[in-house]
């Protein structure tokens, strides 16, 4: 029987032995190449050159250095065989000159080949006792050497060769056959080395169409090879097997047979598993397949739905109470539940992937059939499955056990009918998990415990709004967040005093002004400053104009000497010159709409322009215009904060006899632009008598004084702030300015 002798060729042919070098009885001097596999009946056989594997005959001994035509002609059978290449004496010397090869004493390629033939099999019987390697008294004469010093002769390669083929028929006589054979084609390969000993039997195919022409039978000294046609070879084999079909094998039939054989082999091995488990003392669980047809009531047609396969696992010792376990986590993540067949099991599963198309004609939409149940750790309202509805219950929880208690298919169908008529009022949740994470429960009769409870309780809790809006207002934590943010922010600002009053006014919740102080009493004091009639008229006219036509107040570096001053509690800017000089780098130019001419005292470093129409200089800027917006603010401002307001000075006309001296004094004070002291603005005397501003001739009043009928500040001066909303807008703008 021919056997492969070259491991290199086997290494490059993982799926087939075609192209491997074979020999008879491990005789490396008579080798050939396994061309292809043919099918004779139901058996498969390898095809190669017959003269290479036929039983050899004894040939006369030839000297190693005799490589002449006379020596080769001694084995010739006729004049037609003089051009046939025969280097059969030593396969290691093929296409080489023996005299040109020099071997070292330690070379592994040195092989002593005795050309004298003692028997037909070229095998010399050696007694076991004569072997030196088994003699303990004889030392090993081999010397060590580096692996790269060893000379390896290239021999018997299985790489494919390319060339051109001539369609010319001829007869060729081979010495070993003693007859002539038909050779239909002759090919001339394009390779560095010509065909050597052992290449007989190599298959020749077309490089473009993969058509098999035949196999190599001989070669000549010119490097040309002779091919035996495959058709003639199959006809010769058919003559020896009249009742069998001889042809090249069909790959599809072979693969189908291999798959069937593998399936049967695996089935036999799995059938022996229970016996092996019993031998180990274990109780195996039998596995079988059960088909369930998803049918509901008569109004629903599920004839187009295929059958669902799932594995039912039961224990041998509990036949009456069988358990159906859910599928483990070995399922793929891209599983989709549609109308294709789904097989559920612990080890063998066939899943429909997400990219497989589903015909719309075989799908009937029915809402409320498929339901999605979330795990208890993440409760959420369920939603119907997208696409085609499947009458099965879906669960994402693992480790849950369901009991069947002998349910028949009729009971299962009635249960599915109830599922089809279930309540569909549950709203779909767009944030719910995708159904690709779900698993089909093997048993559909028993619903998962707590499914309805989890869904209803979660949904009702999401929609419950029993709290009163007033309670929500009381629980509002926005002011506290503002308080914390501003408290941490003012620790980083260079001027922390600017935010102290602002944060207290914006974030305090519980302080309110008592009702008895809603409308403050305004009285004139005997020591009020008296101005001239011209000044009184100008002040009255200006206040009326501001009440009728609110203008845009510009806050910038103020140069007017008669502007309204700021409270002295905030660091005053004192100057002995005639004008106010403020560092322009420390403030920002801002313009905002406001219907009042009064500004909060916490706005340090800014002074509004004088309301008079005189030729006093005004500060003009290109700033942001921020009109006030009506934003409600429920909190109150501390009552101990005072704000000065203009007084109707027209009632002071009768006091002209005292006005001359007072006016001169006041003009002198205003031109000098002296900042009022804290005692003059916020006196510590009687609270019922509002103090008077010595700089702008105004009376201070409580800013939190509210009227009972309207939600406005109880300030009669028409040119001042008239709503708490405007105050909040002003404070919000100041906070943004200080932060940014």
UniProtKB/Swiss-Prot annotation:
Taxonomically, which superkingdom? Eukaryota
Q: Which UniProt keywords apply?
A: Virulence
Q: Does the keyword Iron apply?
A: no
Question: Tell me, what's a Pfam family for it?
Answer: GATA_AreA
Keyword Nucleotide-binding assigned: no
Q: In which pathway does it act?
A: Mycotoxin biosynthesis
- Quote the InterPro entries the UniProt record gives: AreA_GATA
Compositionally biased residues, Polar residues: 668-682
Basic and acidic residues biased stretches: 656-667
Region of interest called Disordered, as start-end residue ranges on this chain:
353-391, 414-434, 514-535, 656-686
What is the purpose of this protein? Part of the gene cluster that mediates the biosynthesis of gramillins A and B, bicyclic lipopeptides that induce cell death in maize leaves but not in wheat leaves. The nonribosomal peptide synthetase GRA1 incorporates respectively a glutamic adic (Glu), a leucine (Leu), a serine (Ser), a hydroxyglutamine (HOGln), a 2-amino decanoic acid, and 2 cysteins (CysB and CysA). The biosynthesis of 2-amino decanoic acid incorporated in gramillins could be initiated by a fatty acid synthase composed of the alpha and beta subunits FGSG_00036 and FGSG_11656.
Protein name in the entry: Gramillins biosynthetic cluster protein FGSG_11657
């Amino acid at each position: 029987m021919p056997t492969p002798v070259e491991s290199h060729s086997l290494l490059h042919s993982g799926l087939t032995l075609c192209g491997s070098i074979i020999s008879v009885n491990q005789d490396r001097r008579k080798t050939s190449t396994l061309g292809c596999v043919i099918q004779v009946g139901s058996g498969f056989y390898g095809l190669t050159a017959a003269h290479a594997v036929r039983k050899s005959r004894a040939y006369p001994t030839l000297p190693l250095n005799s490589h002449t035509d006379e020596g080769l002609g001694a084995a010739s059978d006729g004049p037609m065989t003089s051009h046939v290449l025969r280097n059969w004496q030593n396969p290691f010397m093929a296409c080489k000159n023996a005299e040109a090869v020099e071997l070292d004493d330690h070379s592994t390629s040195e092989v002593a080949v005795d050309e004298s033939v003692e028997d037909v099999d070229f095998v010399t019987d050696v007694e076991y006792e004569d072997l030196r390697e088994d003699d303990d008294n004889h030392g090993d004469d081999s010397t060590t050497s580096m692996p790269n010093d060893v000379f390896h002769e290239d021999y018997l390669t299985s790489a494919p060769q390319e060339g051109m083929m001539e369609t010319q028929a001829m007869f060729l006589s081979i010495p070993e056959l003693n007859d002539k054979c038909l050779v239909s084609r002759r090919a001339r390969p394009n390779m560095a080395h010509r065909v050597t000993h052992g290449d007989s039997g190599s298959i020749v195919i077309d490089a473009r169409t993969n058509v098999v022409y035949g196999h190599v039978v001989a070669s000549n000294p010119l490097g040309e090879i002779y091919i035996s046609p495959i058709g003639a070879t199959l006809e010769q084999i058919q003559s020896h097997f009249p009742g069998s079909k001889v042809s090249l094998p069909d790959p599809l039939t072979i693969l189908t047979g291999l798959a069937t054989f593998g399936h049967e082999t695996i089935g036999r091995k799995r059938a022996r598993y229970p016996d092996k488990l019993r031998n180990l003392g274990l109780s195996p669980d039998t596995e079988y397949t059960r088909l369930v047809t998803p049918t509901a009531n008569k109004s629903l047609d599920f004839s187009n739905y295929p059958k669902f396969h799932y594995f039912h696992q039961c224990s041998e010792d509990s036949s009456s109470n069988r358990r159906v376990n859910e599928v483990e986590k070995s399922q793929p993540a891209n599983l989709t539940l549609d109308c294709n067949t789904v097989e559920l099991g612990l080890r063998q599963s066939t899943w429909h992937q997400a990219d497989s198309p589903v015909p719309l004609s075989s799908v009937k939409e029915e809402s409320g059939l498929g339901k999605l149940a979330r795990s208890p750790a993440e409760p959420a309202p369920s939603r119907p499955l997208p696409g085609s509805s499947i009458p099965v219950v879906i669960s994402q929880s693992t480790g849950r056990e369901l009991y069947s208690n002998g349910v028949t298919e009729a009971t299962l169908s009635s249960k599915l009918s109830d599922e089809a008529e279930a309540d569909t009022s549950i709203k779909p949740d767009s944030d719910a998990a995708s159904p690709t994470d779900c698993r089909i429960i093997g048993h559909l009769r028993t619903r998962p415990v707590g499914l309805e409870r989890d869904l209803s309780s979660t949904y009702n809790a999401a929609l419950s709004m029993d709290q009163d809006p007033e309670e929500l207002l009381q629980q509002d934590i926005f002011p506290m967040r503002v308080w914390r943010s501003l408290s941490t922010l003012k620790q980083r600002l260079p001027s922390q005093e600017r935010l102290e009053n602002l944060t207290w006014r914006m974030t305090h919740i519980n302080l309110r002004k008592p009702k008895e102080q809603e409308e403050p009493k305004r009285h004139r004091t005997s020591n009020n400053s008296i101005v001239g009639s011209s000044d009184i008229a100008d002040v009255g006219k200006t206040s009326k104009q501001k009440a009728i036509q609110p203008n845009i107040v510009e806050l910038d570096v103020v140069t007017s000497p008669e502007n309204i001053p700021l409270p002295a509690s905030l660091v005053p800017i004192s100057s002995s010159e005639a004008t106010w000089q403020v560092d322009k780098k420390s403030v920002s130019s801002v313009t905002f709409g406001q219907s009042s001419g009064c500004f909060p005292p916490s706005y340090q470093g800014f002074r509004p322009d004088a309301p008079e129409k005189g030729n006093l200089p005004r500060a003009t800027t290109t700033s942001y215009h921020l009109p006030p917006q009506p934003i409600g603010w429920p909190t109150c401002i501390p009552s101990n904060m005072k704000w000065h307001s203009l007084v109707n000075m027209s009632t002071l006309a009768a006091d002209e006899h005292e006005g001359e001296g007072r006016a001169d004094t006041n003009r002198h004070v205003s031109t000098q632009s002296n900042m009022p002291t804290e005692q003059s603005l916020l006196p510590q005397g009687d609270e019922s008598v509002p103090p008077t501003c010595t700089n702008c001739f105004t009376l201070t009043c409580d800013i939190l004084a509210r009227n009972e009928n309207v939600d406005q500040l109880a300030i009669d001066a028409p040119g001042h702030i008239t709503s708490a909303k405007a105050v909040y807008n002003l404070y919000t703008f100041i906070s943004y300015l200080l932060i940014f």
